[in-house]
Regions:
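Hydrophobic transmembrane alpha-helices and immediately adjacent juxtamembrane helices
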Residues: 1-176
Length: 177
């Protein structure tokens, strides 16, 4: 069984490298479609987390008398990461079913679609971290050198969300959720 698993993993890695241009095109298409009819375009990736943080900050700070220092920064970091996880898993869930016409026409490994959704959401999350930096500057939060290590948990979250999206997409095809 371990040999079968290894061959399967090698084949998946080979397909991933082979279809990398397709993943790039799917991510590019997804980002263009997401902001196509928007007046502000990609600025929404920064503006949306800021507006959510502002609203939640007002509600939790003033209505509930919450006096946590740098509370808006905690809110925007948590919201950005949760939004990434939520969108990656929910879009990964339906990605294979939505691309069924393409899958029926030509051979494409089905795992390409949830992975492209995860990469697309990761790029959007990286744009959203511009809003996090703005909040850090605005709230005068202390910058530590450990901020340069923040990429590691982001990569781990990406792989976890991508794996969960792959699992959910397989279940969605099987159970037609």
């Amino acid at each position: 069984m371990a040999e079968t698993m290894q061959v399967s993993a090698q084949r998946a890695w080979t397909h991933l490298k082979k279809y990398q241009p397709l993943i790039h095109e799917l991510v590019s298409r997804d980002l263009k479609v997401k902001y196509r009819r928007s007046f502000l375009g990609y600025i929404w990736s920064i503006l949306n987390p800021l507006l959510m943080m502002l609203l939640q900050s007002i509600i939790f700070s003033y209505m509930f008398r919450n006096d946590i220092p740098n509370f808006p920064l905690y809110l925007i970091c948590g919201n950005t990461l949760f939004t990434f996880f939520n969108e990656t898993t929910s879009m990964g869930l339906t990605s294979v079913i939505q691309n069924a016409p393409l899958i029926k026409k030509v051979y494409i490994p089905k795992f390409i679609f949830p992975i492209s959704q995860a990469v697309s959401r990761f790029v959007t999350m990286l744009f959203s971290f511009g809003a996090v930096l703005l909040v850090m500057i605005f709230t005068r939060a202390t910058f530590y050198w450990t901020i340069f290590l923040s990429w590691l948990p982001l990569v781990l979250l990406f792989f976890f969300s991508c794996g969960l999206g792959l699992l959910l997409s397989a279940l969605a095809v099987y159970f037609r959720i």
